[in-house]
């Protein structure tokens, strides 16, 4: 226990930043139960804010009981605990494991503010299973890198303190501490690939090769190093191809080999936090989107979004709900949070680049995303035009035209964020600042 706590302390000390908190993903299983005990001790020793979150998927009839136990154990450990309910949209052919995992991390992300740490309980056996599953899928070095001890997550960092510790060691320590934990009955169902490996494959591998966990950890680490090196070698090329609006220049891509091009597209999608495409999808991005006829409007649907082409550039378009019906009043010098992760908007009077004159009644200013039927007269133009035409003239891709904030004064367009100010509202009172998500 002491050596594990020492390792735990070293990890948290390395990653913890002052004025932040530590969040524990707490399922109540033996892994997170031991992490709760370690975190409770660390909190007493270092006096830092800690919080636990139980994600309730509703997949088991025991979930309510597990949630109750998790809150009880957390209270006994002196750590606050929330129960976060999620619902899964089960579609034919989709993995329940994958859907549950995605929903769990989306729920946990809501608790992570800038610099916070998220602790999860993956251990050495999980790493071995992940490696074998990646082999089964035919993954390359990226997939075989498996899980890192730490990785960026939401606005903070995800840390896996148990990643080099075997399951049987975790159980032995938990028993020595007389801890109770929950047993998820689904972990015995060998219809799931991971459970099949856990119960039928990994024990045989370990019996034959007792150092298999360390060997896999070493291979995963070497694969991760190769991935990092590839990114470093292509970094300059990547940033030549990457445009200010996060699109990717097709001409720059075309000047490189097929292998380098595929890697650059993967780097681009990774920067957008998109799920990695398959080899077939990667080929289609180039052949059917990038190289489509010039008069075509090509796109390729992937999970979470689609790749599109506009003016010889590739764009990643995230799936977003329709926002053109959204309209909210905006106050001067107060940040307005936009829907669907579209960022923040502010009318700032403290800027040195003021371009807008405030109207007689600023309280009537509002923000919309619907350009339908609106006209405007940009300061730099000789006459007014429909916003639809202006978007074309300003080379705004069609799919973005209902995701750009429009500042309104009653029924008049005051400004379109990042594009122009209407001539009737030109002045030096304030500036419209759109802080887009990274």
Predicted features and spans:
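AMP-forming adenylation/ATP pyrophosphatase catalytic core
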Residues: 5-30, 51, 86, 90, ...
């Amino acid at each position: 226990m002491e050596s594990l706590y020492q390792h735990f302390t070293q990890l948290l000390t390395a990653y913890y930043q002052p004025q932040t908190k530590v969040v524990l993903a707490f399922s109540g299983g033996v892994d997170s139960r031991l992490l709760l005990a370690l975190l409770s001790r660390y909190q007493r020793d270092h006096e830092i804010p800690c919080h636990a979150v139980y994600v309730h998927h509703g997949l088991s009839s025991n979930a309510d009981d597990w949630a109750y136990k998790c809150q009880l154990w957390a209270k006994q450990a002196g750590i606050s605990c929330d129960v976060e309910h999620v619902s899964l949209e089960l579609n034919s052919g989709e993995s329940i494991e994958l859907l549950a995992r995605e929903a769990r991390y989306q729920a946990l992300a809501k608790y992570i503010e800038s610099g916070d740490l998220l602790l999860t309980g993956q251990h050495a056996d999980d790493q071995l299973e992940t490696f074998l599953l990646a082999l089964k899928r035919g993954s390359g070095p990226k997939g075989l890198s498996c899980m890192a001890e730490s990785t960026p997550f939401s606005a903070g960092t995800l840390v896996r303190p148990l990643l080099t510790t075997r399951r049987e060691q975790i159980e032995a320590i938990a028993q020595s501490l007389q801890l109770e934990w929950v047993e998820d009955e689904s972990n015995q169902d060998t219809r799931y690939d991971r459970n099949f490996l856990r119960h039928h494959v990994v024990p045989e591998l370990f019996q034959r090769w007792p150092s298999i966990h360390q060997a896999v950890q070493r291979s995963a680490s070497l694969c991760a190093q190769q991935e990092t090196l590839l990114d470093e070698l292509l970094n300059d090329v990547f940033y030549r191809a990457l445009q200010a609006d996060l699109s990717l220049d097709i001409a720059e891509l075309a000047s490189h080999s097929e292998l380098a091009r595929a890697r650059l597209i993967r780097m681009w999608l990774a920067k957008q936090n998109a799920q990695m495409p398959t080899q077939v999808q990667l080929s289609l991005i180039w052949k059917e989107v990038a190289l489509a006829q010039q008069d075509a409007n090509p796109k390729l649907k992937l999970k979470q979004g689609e790749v599109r082409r506009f003016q010889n550039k590739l764009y990643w378009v995230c799936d977003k709900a329709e926002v053109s019906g959204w309209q909210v009043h905006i106050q001067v010098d107060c940040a307005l949070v936009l829907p669907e992760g579209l960022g923040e908007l502010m009318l700032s009077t403290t800027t040195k680049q003021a371009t807008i004159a405030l109207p007689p009644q600023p309280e009537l200013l509002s923000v919309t995303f619907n350009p339908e039927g609106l006209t405007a007269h940009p300061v730099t133009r000789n006459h007014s035009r429909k916003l639809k035409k202006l978007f074309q003239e300003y080379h705004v891709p069609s799919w973005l035209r209902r995701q750009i904030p429009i500042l309104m004064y009653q029924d008049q367009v005051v400004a379109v964020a990042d594009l122009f100010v209407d001539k009737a509202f030109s002045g030096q009172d304030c500036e419209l600042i759109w802080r887009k998500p990274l």
